[in-house]
Amino acid sequence: MAAGSDLLDEVFFNSEVDEKVVSDLVGSLESQLAASAAHHHHLAPRTPEVRAAAAGALGNHVVSGSPAGAAGAGPAAPAEGAPGAAPEPPPAGRARPGGGGPQRPGPPSPRRPLVPAGPAPPAAKLRPPPEGSAGSCAPVPAAAAVAAGPEPAPAGPAKPAGPAALAARAGPGPGPGPGPGPGPGPGKPAGPGAAQTLNGSAALLNSHHAAAPAVSLVNNGPAALLPLPKPAAPGTVIQTPPFVGAAAPPAPAAPSPPAAPAPAAPAAAPPPPPPAPATLARPPGHPAGPPTAAPAVPPPAAAQNGGSAGAAPAPAPAAGGPAGVSGQPGPGAAAAAPAPGVKAESPKRVVQAAPPAAQTLAASGPASTAASMVIGPTMQGALPSPAAVPPPAPGTPTGLPKGAAGAVTQSLSRTPTATTSGIRATLTPTVLAPRLPQPPQNPTNIQNFQLPPGMVLVRSENGQLLMIPQQALAQMQAQAHAQPQTTMAPRPATPTSAPPVQISTVQAPGTPIIARQVTPTTIIKQVSQAQTTVQPSATLQRSPGVQPQLVLGGAAQTASLGTATAVQTGTPQRTVPGATTTSSAATETMENVKKCKNFLSTLIKLASSGKQSTETAANVKELVQNLLDGKIEAEDFTSRLYRELNSSPQPYLVPFLKRSLPALRQLTPDSAAFIQQSQQQPPPPTSQATTALTAVVLSSSVQRTAGKTAATVTSALQPPVLSLTQPTQVGVGKQGQPTPLVIQQPPKPGALIRPPQVTLTQTPMVALRQPHNRIMLTTPQQIQLNPLQPVPVVKPAVLPGTKALSAVSAQAAAAQKNKLKEPGGGSFRDDDDINDVASMAGVNLSEESARILATNSELVGTLTRSCKDETFLLQAPLQRRILEIGKKHGITELHPDVVSYVSHATQQRLQNLVEKISETAQQKNFSYKDDDRYEQASDVRAQLKFFEQLDQIEKQRKDEQEREILMRAAKSRSRQEDPEQLRLKQKAKEMQQQELAQMRQRDANLTALAAIGPRKKRKVDCPGPGSGAEGSGPGSVVPGSSGVGTPRQFTRQRITRVNLRDLIFCLENERETSHSLLLYKAFLK
């Protein structure tokens, strides 16, 4: 419990907790917590401390305190409703957690109120803590008061206060002042069993000292705070009537019944050691529901969900004045007859201390002696039904099993003979049978899904949709209705002895409640064969979607639609007696028999498959037959089998055969028929219900979620909870009568659980772990079902903390799918004993696969080429030429490889020659300007340009002279008809016309260039691949002009041409060709 306490403290003192989330959680908790113990016959003895704690009226808020309580506590003023309770300083004692671990200290800063402030009447004022207190409580707008324990104790340095009520509401007596009495006290709630829960789980603390850390119970789901007092402390019940005769109740329409007068115990009674009273105040603002009556429950402690509850103390033998809360002075108190009193108000509380088994909690009603409970608000989330928990021995740390969002617990007596007078002693535990759930408002859409004829869809406990035949569904319902009425233990609906409880809850807006969609369940009562006491079991129910109301008790409607969930609770499951071991041993034997059958049939199939000879197959069959008939034993069988099949010995085979052969010989009387059946067809898969056993152990660690508004599920588990999810509806069975239900082999530790994939509608907070121990229900018959195909509907939002769950679910689903495909069917245990049948049969799988893959087995080991060899030269002319040359040397025949070799040699020679010629030709394009090692000595190109310019100038000068002569001749006015003169004139006119035409052409060109725009010159600063010594190869081709927008400008590709001079240069430099005939022929060309 120490580890769980630390985890709870970590959640509670996390500074990142959103105030609104916590407020909503408290609102949801209070709507689901009802005043427990209001429907018992007896009141346990009350102490003055209890009366003082209950006398202080607390408003609608829970005040949180530091785990190390305040050092000094001022005395509580006497409450108005309890005149006889004198205030006394609290007892000093060292605070320690319930499990004995170190408690994490809280921050010294003032805490925020954990409940939203609502309009509530100021019932009392909160006194600030005195000097030296470790943590201060922040006042809340609604009235709140905490009363200190009245037992005196010597002062100690910085020790927490004694047990004080976390929150208590007490209505005053029928005096003139109808308001609750002011009970000022130190501002630090403390109690020995107070536990911090923030998330809808139930916590059970065991206190070895009189004082424990003061903590708050904040919950969004139904939960109960069950503190276990010191073993020597007598049981105490505090049941305060909520606002009996209050001045201004927050529920507007519900009137307050008058307070019930009850004689109070004398104030001088010596106070026994204080137990752990804890009270939860409910914030106002939720409407009241229809009133119903509450059943009387024989177990010693109970906490029920619900809305407002009204309770008044029963009359005790002692005489006294009227008090709002009165206790009974002695342990042997008389029983109070229940009477129907109804009060429908929103505020409610749970004040409960779990006593030793010798005393019984009871509750009293507001109208004189009344034991009735009205629990009415509507529900908008998931509502788990109460789960019964037998109390462990005092002094042992115990954890409560965690439900969907936390379970309201009922402490059922495991020793019914120890009940006091007036309580009917019965061995039958309380049977809670919920009604059928109403369909949710938002049904799940399943698109493109065709249901086979005769099948129906039901929703399982995990939120999955399962396909079940209609006949099976009808059998489930008929079986559920056909159970005997004595096993149902129905409670009469009349409010005389055991009125039913109607439980509803209101979810605050924005409160995240983890909704699991399941169908209602019934209870499997399991009887311990080695013990006389009945192990009480209860149902863990999660309602689907939005379910308005759920009736517990009354006429139990056991006909259901889907799978039933039975949660085995109570003491750790190691106490389940010897039937478990025998059943599990039988199951293991059957599993071994099945695997041995598969092994032998596979052996026969492999031997007779054609790979082996017929003689080997016959010998293997004879060996198997002799083994089944008992003629030979396992050692002889395996040795002869190894010799027959030439296989390596298997060390696990002999022990496996020894374990499974006796049962196999009993189940297989006819060995010849078994061998024949193995040869004909593979063994049919055994029909198994794959959803029979789902071990879902709720993790004890705190699952932290990423978002602030996501709800978390935490609980401190001591015994693991095994949830037996069954594909059939299981009715309530008789005690001692085995319940018909489908049983699978329990998963051994370390094996893979193969349940259907867990699909949750909210953040998946359930961790799949291996159970520490196994529960087997002995069954006279087994219902064989076809494997149900789960249809997952909601894809869970996987958070960082749930990757392991997703991985386990995926692996389980894949393994289950593979197992169902196998001919022998899937088992829940790894086949580690015998898993290599092929090697035992002498089949080498690697050789077989190699033979299958090798299409041409004759080519194995030879050189294979991926492509056909192609010759460079034509085969026929080359062969003819080679034969012509060979005739001179006496060669008449030629191998085809010779032609190929000569062709390849020719190709290689030409390739080398072309490479050399290319290198030679590239040297002509080598630019020495770019090399820094060279300087330009002469510019031949510039000299040539200069000579060209000289020639051009000379020609221009001659043209000018001729033109000048022509112009002079044209201008002459001589009248002589000289033919030479006429010729010159004509030539001058043509020259002028030609000049005019040239001028027009030049003007037109300039105009066109101006219209086109300036030319973009190529940049030469970044040389491309074609510049320099490159460009001769045929592979690199770069376009001559560069694009306009390209960032890199390429220069024009320079093409290197290889000419005959380059070839001659190469032939001259080679030794082989420097004096060859080919070189001289090249010179001649």
Swiss-Prot record:
GO terms for biological process: DNA-templated transcription initiation; mRNA transcription by RNA polymerase II; ovarian follicle development; positive regulation of DNA-templated transcription; positive regulation of transcription initiation by RNA polymerase II; regulation of DNA repair; regulation of transcription by RNA polymerase II; RNA polymerase II preinitiation complex assembly. Residues 408-425 have a biased composition (Polar residues). Residues 66-85, 132-150, 158-171, 191-204, 302-320, 331-341, 396-407, 1035-1047 have a biased composition (Low complexity). Residues 321-330, 1025-1034 have a biased composition (Gly residues). It holds the Pfam family TAFH. Residues 590-687 form the TAFH domain. GO terms for cellular component: chromatin; cytosol; male germ cell nucleus; MLL1 complex; nucleoplasm; nucleus; protein-containing complex; transcription factor TFIID complex. One of its GO terms (molecular function) is DNA binding. Coiled coil: none annotated. The modification N6,N6-dimethyllysine is found at K594, K595, K597, K605, K611, K621, K631, K658. Belongs to the TAF4 family. The TFIID basal transcription factor complex plays a major role in the initiation of RNA polymerase II (Pol II)-dependent transcription. TFIID recognizes and binds promoters with or without a TATA box via its subunit TBP, a TATA-box-binding protein, and promotes assembly of the pre-initiation complex (PIC). The TFIID complex consists of TBP and TBP-associated factors (TAFs), including TAF1, TAF2, TAF3, TAF4, TAF5, TAF6, TAF7, TAF8, TAF9, TAF10, TAF11, TAF12 and TAF13. This is Transcription initiation factor TFIID subunit 4. It comes from Homo sapiens. The gene is TAF4.
